[in-house]
Design a protein with these regions (language model features):
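Contiguous, well-folded functional domains in the mature portion of proteins
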Residues: 1-212
Length: 212
């Protein structure tokens, strides 16, 4: 089944903005139509869903999102792993593709939505303060945790999956609207293959490899 190039979640707001542009241009002035028209063009760009080819091996983790690696660190994770693990933080600007993909094939065995604040997603510590949505993906022999974090502009996290769903490698499962951050938590048996500052492509860039 061919996937739409524009995410359906954006149809409503895109349609409203272009209708405002048409009405403004028709009843008031073409100059009035410029701002909503440009906003509509940007929203088409923001809600894009480009085709990605998943070529990673079964033991390789792909990036869940487009963006830039902000941090790689050891942390104590107390909602899914309940132990120290490594966290990779990816910042998504308003110009990145914002759909999110499963880094690994497996079953969703954990799902948690947490209300919070809307601080800028690039600031340190927002993963503990901002609104966020997490899923745990269980491959059978290995598990990972992915957390999507809202930002100062990103006020809504959209999920298209439920607890118990089976995800394919690189499968779309959600998005964060208008600038955000994604965190990937992995066990010690994963060899991290990216570095701070690296640019990532969701579903294509290999960020880690299971070594056991």
């Amino acid at each position: 089944l061919k996937k739409p190039y524009i995410i359906p979640d954006g149809y409503g707001i895109i349609g409203i903005v272009f209708i405002l542009a048409i009405l403004g241009g028709y009843f008031i002035s073409l100059y009035v139509a410029v701002i909503p028209f440009l906003l509509g063009v940007y929203l088409l760009y923001f809600f894009r869903n480009p085709t990605r080819t998943i070529t990673a091996a079964a033991n390789e983790l792909v990036s869940p999102a487009d963006g830039t690696v902000m941090a790689i660190e050891w942390v104590q994770e107390d909602s899914y792993f309940f132990k120290k693990c490594r966290k990779i933080v990816v910042f998504l600007s308003v110009f990145n593709v914002h759909v999110n993909r499963a880094p690994l094939a497996g079953t969703i065995d954990f799902q948690q939505y947490t209300c919070g604040r809307f601080k800028p997603a690039y600031k340190e510590g927002v993963g503990y303060e901002n609104e966020r949505y997490s899923i745990g993906i269980n491959k059978g022999t290995h598990r990972i945790l992915v957390t999507l974090i809202a930002g100062i502009l990103a006020r809504r996290i959209v999920s298209w999956v439920s607890l118990g769903d089976r995800l394919d490698h690189g499968q779309l499962y959600g998005m964060i609207k208008l600038g955000s951050c994604a965190e990937i938590y992995v066990d010690e048996d994963v060899d991290i293959l990216v570095h701070i500052g690296d640019k990532l492509r969701g579903g294509e860039t290999v960020i880690g490899r299971i070594i056991s």
